[in-house]
Amino acid sequence: MGVPSFFRWLSRKYPKIISPVLEEQPQIVDGVILPLDYSASNPNGELDNLYLDMNGIVHPCSHPENKPPPETEDEMLLAVFEYTNRVLNMARPRKVLVMAVDGVAPRAKMNQQRARRFRSARDAQIENEAREEIMRQREEVGEIIDDAVRNKKTWDSNAITPGTPFMDKLAAALRYWTAFKLATDPGWKNLQVIISDATVPGEGEHKIMNFIRSQRADPEYNPNTTHCIYGLDADLIFLGLATHEPHFKILREDVFAQDNRKRNNLKDTINMTEEEKQFLQKQNSEQPFLWLHINVLREYLSAELWVPGLPFTFDLERAIDDWVFMCFFCGNDFLPHLPCLDVRENSIDILLDIWKVVLPKLKTYMTCDGVLNLPSVETLLQHLGSREGDIFKTRHIQEARKKEAFERRKAQKNMSKGQDRHPTVATEQLQMYDTQGNLAKGSWNLTTSDMVRLKKELMLANEGNEEAIAKVKQQSDKNNELMKDISKEEIDDAVSKANKTNFNLAEVMKQKIINKKHRLEKDNEEEEIAKDSKKVKTEKAESECDLDAEIKDEIVADVNDRENSETTEVSRDSPVHSTVNVSEGPKNGVFDTDEFVKLFEPGYHERYYTAKFHVTPQDIEQLRKDMVKCYIEGVAWVLMYYYQGCASWNWFYPYHYAPLATDFHGFSHLEIKFEEGTPFLPYEQLMSVLPAASGHALPKIFRSLMSEPDSEIIDFYPEEFPIDMNGKKMSWQGIALLPFIDQDRLLTAVRAQYPLLSDAERARNIRGEPVLLISNKNANYERFSKKLYSKENNNNNVVVKFQHFKSGLSGIVSKDVEGFELNGKIVCPIQGGSLPNLSTTLILKMSYRLIPLPSRNKSIILNGFIPSEPVLTAYDLDSIMYKYNNQNYSRRWNFGNDLKQNIVPVGPKGITQYKPRTGGYRAFFYFAELSRNNVQPAHNYGRNSYNSQPGFNNSRYDGGNNNYRQNSNYRNNNYSGNRNSGQYSGNSYSRNNKQSRYDNSRANRR
């Protein structure tokens, strides 16, 4: 989700929420790599359910950052299998595995998908042009480029969208690989695998959320089920908190470890040797992973969100929901973030401070089970609005200081390298001589870049080649025309700037030339607008200038928002910004409206709406009211989406920008209602989000709608579109100002083509259902196979409802819509990889549906749960409550949890911060079963702190009294001694005399 740097900020502020994954390495015997034993105990602790957001796996496998991309789609799918298998060997779920692929998204998400895919197509075009230029330069120096390399084009990642042939092949491949593992891996015998492919509407992570909500509604659900979700998106943290499941963690790659990796640019990957590819493959396979523990985050938040003196009872679950809601204002995939809020500037802390001030004055919390309390929200935003001007001024001062500090460090670095000299001026007049040494008539005006590019022609021209002389003269005349209006004063100014910033003079002059090209293009466009109003060509020189910036921006994006370089390297890496025409708005190019708005100066309110919406001052008030109404509807929709499911498939926010915080007033009595509607079909979404350049992913009958000038919806697919940097530094952070889709016009045009679809194309344009696959060792195999696939039963409408107790899964199953047979065969859909066809005698495949929720989902901890042992020390809690770190989060690249802290004991507790009672009859039977089977509870984080005896570290369960005799290492929950040694005893924890204050704070809370 669109919350840049949220994970980085969160892990720095709450360092103990993360810990490294303990990954077993396969053994190598006689050069053969032996697979890991999936059934062996997990060094990270046992896990019940694992959820995979498959798009987070497919994308990096299709275009990896540290190695050349796969040559074919089959290689991509094999890479997906390998990566998924590695994740499963780390997590080792024992009961349920859910693979969720993004299906058709709500309209609110489509706008963001549309912007991403249009920019992705543009980046792919730039990369292809860069490849061609690199190959041309290499051929000029005599290098031979193979035809296979020359003709290869970058694979279009926009194919990873529901309805494309690739997604259809991905679904078949996942079903095959799951069946293969169930049939061949003994460790999978009890695993139940649900695959929700792209034909099932909804985003992958929210399909997972719907699954968890459905399981919690089952009366037989075990409240101590352990959950883990894999993915890099920031919203997975919100989703983990929104489930209110106490045993939840997130598995993700360690992005901190990536920072020191060598990254390969475009030139490196064109003619890479096999040895280099194998090295990168090994380096990529060694990418470390880490856990993010939601239960530890809840511990931090229990201290962070504590507010004394409330007129109502403090409820941690409601407070966490309010915290999640406030984070939405800093960024999400459905709404633009408020201009005054940025996670990197500790905006969440600003909102939290306001929340703590206003909460005692309110009657209740801001949210309840995903529903907003609008008067409370208005109070919060009004207080934020009163701080908005100061926030903008502080941001401007900090950015100026960072820029000054960077330039100072850069100058010192250059001086130490002897680079503080006057920059070399590019040769402006290059004299040419004939073969007899006579001076040629006239003179050439060539830049250094021209001389490098025309090196071969210059050599031939010196030898008297007329064709080469003509080509060089053509470039010289072109430069003369461009330099005609640039005065000597401007040249001197460029030299001065180059001296001041240590930039290359040629680059500064090139920018001046390109700026003039912008003016010439604009004049030509106005003259020829009657002839051609839609086709605007970009000059070759502009493409060359922007090429390096685009590639560098992609590298910076992969490094995951490296803050220190974001504010400092823009002047070299960001594209040239054009002048903003606030009266009508630019038609293409990259610009920055914030250069005109100047949010840090008085009067920014009117300038903001004038520059970004091109309205007159008289129309601002009406625009403001409508934007505030739509934005509040949006945050209500987002909150409902996270806690209850999609409230409306057709609602979307109809603006590219958010209102200012000072404008949020007068909405407390707003009545918010949503019409649920229905999701688009896959082809309808493809036509909504894909650019014309990606039309190859659609059936041919739709492509003319995207490219023909007489198409009734041609205006939805602009070839050029403006990008507003909106005050950001890197090009990927800019806002693509694309026209919003008119749903009625689009659906009318698309549905008129449906009768022309082939059967195969029509099969990809459906709303499907998830499938459930189990092995013949599963507890439900006999029941399901007999009722659904027996020869005596020919009724295709038979459904079987089953509940959680027997297998840890509940739902409704029916016959597989693809015609699964008990004695059939599953054909491998992938060429290569030596994967065999499978017999279906060892597995069972069924259509799967969730049990409908009887009522609204409640945001509570379920009765009968068993809390984990606390991980945080008194000092950790004090540092949050009393802000010892003063908001300077300095964890850097170290883990808050080391390996020892990752292995924490888990056991029943008599005193807990949660309101529902602990234990109960479910816990009694749960522990009785554990004792009989001599196994560890599934919500442990490790095994090293347990001895060979069953139970919880030599503790004894005394009937139903919730009285436990704990090991002396954990007596009275009050720790003392050396914090690093892990040995705790006694009744107090002594650390800088902080314990007394901590005890007093706990007493006050009670």
UniProtKB/Swiss-Prot annotation:
Region listing for Disordered, in residue ranges: 561-584, 939-1006
CDD domains referenced in this protein's UniProt entry, alphabetically: PIN_XRN1-2-like
GO biological process: cleavage in ITS2 between 5.8S rRNA and LSU-rRNA of tricistronic rRNA transcript (SSU-rRNA, 5.8S rRNA, LSU-rRNA); mRNA splicing, via spliceosome; NAD-cap decapping; negative regulation of transcription elongation by RNA polymerase II; nuclear mRNA surveillance; nuclear polyadenylation-dependent rRNA catabolic process; nuclear-transcribed mRNA catabolic process; positive regulation of termination of RNA polymerase II transcription
Protein name: 5'-3' exoribonuclease 2
Chain positions with Phosphoserine modification: 574
Regulation of this protein's activity per its record: Inhibited by nucleoside 3', 5'-bisphosphates.
Sequence segments annotated as region (2 X 4 AA repeats of S-R-Y-D, N-N-N-Y, Y-S-G-N): 955-999
Known partners and oligomeric status: Interacts with RAI1 and RTT103.
GO molecular function, one term: RNA binding
Cofactor: Mg(2+); Mn(2+)
Lineage start: Eukaryota, Fungi, Dikarya, Ascomycota, Saccharomycotina
Keyword Aminoacyl-tRNA synthetase: no
A Pfam cross-reference name: XRN_M
Compositional bias annotation for Polar residues: 939-956
E.C. code: 3.1.13.-
Family as reported in the entry's similarity comment: Belongs to the 5'-3' exonuclease family. XRN2/RAT1 subfamily.
Coiled coil (residue ranges): 256-287, 453-544
Chain intervals with Low complexity compositional bias: 959-993
PANTHER family: 5'-3' EXORIBONUCLEASE 2 (PTHR12341:SF41), 5'->3' EXORIBONUCLEASE (PTHR12341)
Outcome of swapping residue 518 to Y: Causes mislocalization to the cytoplasm and suppresses the requirement for XRN1 function
Other facts noted in the record for this chain: Present with 623 molecules/cell in log phase SD medium.
GO cellular component, one term: nucleus
Compartments where located: Nucleus
